[in-house]
From Swiss-Prot:
Source taxon at top rank: Bacteria
Cofactor: Mg(2+)
Protein's organism: Wolinella succinogenes (strain ATCC 29543 / DSM 1740 / CCUG 13145 / JCM 31913 / LMG 7466 / NCTC 11488 / FDC 602W) (Vibrio succinogenes)
Pfam families: PFK (PF00365)
Sites where the protein binds ADP: R154, G185, A186, E187
The reaction(s) this protein catalyses: beta-D-fructose 6-phosphate + ATP = beta-D-fructose 1,6-bisphosphate + ADP + H(+)
Protein name: ATP-dependent 6-phosphofructokinase
Residues forming the catalytic site: D127 (proton acceptor)
Amino acid sequence: MRIGLVCSGGDCAGMNPATKKFVEYSLELGYEPYFIREGLEGLIEGKIEPATLKEVSGILHKGGTILQSSRSKRFFDPAFRLQAYQNLQRHSIEALVTLGGDGSFRAMEVLAKEHSLLYAGIPATIDNDIRASDYALGVDSALNVILESTDRLRDTAESFRRAFVVEVMGRDCGYLALASAIACGAEVCIIPEMGYSLQSLGARLKEELGTGKRRYVLAIVSEGAKASSEVVSWLKEEVGIETRITILGHVQRGGSPSVYDRLMGFRFMQKALDSLSLGKSGVVVLREGRVEFLSSQEASSAPASLPLDMVRLASRLMF
């Protein structure tokens, strides 16, 4: 069987370790691995080629993806999906592994249903917003970037008796903000899934700053909460502390993958290929420490939620 690998949507650390495992394990199973370059746009344009061990040698430490990625509006046009499938047919590719997020998985599901194609989706997004999975590739590496940045900002905040508002990525999911706020010892955490009370937070912070218990404030705000400017104004005008804002942006996606992301890349890919070899299509997920393979329907119907124990840990940072 010939199997293709495509990276779709936003890049993240962990994609390259998964890519290396794709080639090595496919060959071990007796399959022929193929690379699709430049994401779904590359699939439409026919940028498909045989994958070799030489290409994946020495890529474990590299961030992003050696295959390159893209976002493709054209893929939602049936005519372009047919073109993509015909490109797969030219290479006799019977199955696809997709590294990406929910949008990429939905696109693959449509293509698979239209043309009886096997596919396996592997969560790869720093947003960690795949409903059925506790984890997506890139999250741990992104958190390490955030932690390094907040540790540095804390140094300068304490030196000048300032507040820093740090906006982190995550779209509509507050996992990155929640986890990093707990881990870096932030005083404020604002995420889209939870309400917050600046009034009660302000009373506590003013008391601590006024009595000398605290010299600085670190606030972590998820981009999806759309509250960074509000928090900056509140800290300046209500709490009464000089405030700066830092938007970390795409730096969170880059850099060498962490040990955990490398291991999860291997585990996710092995499960994906094992499932395809059994004729199954669906999505690889991590649930309660176990790597599982779910049908697309099971994966999409799972409720969206943050870990309750983490929410409890951070409750003092919101109210």
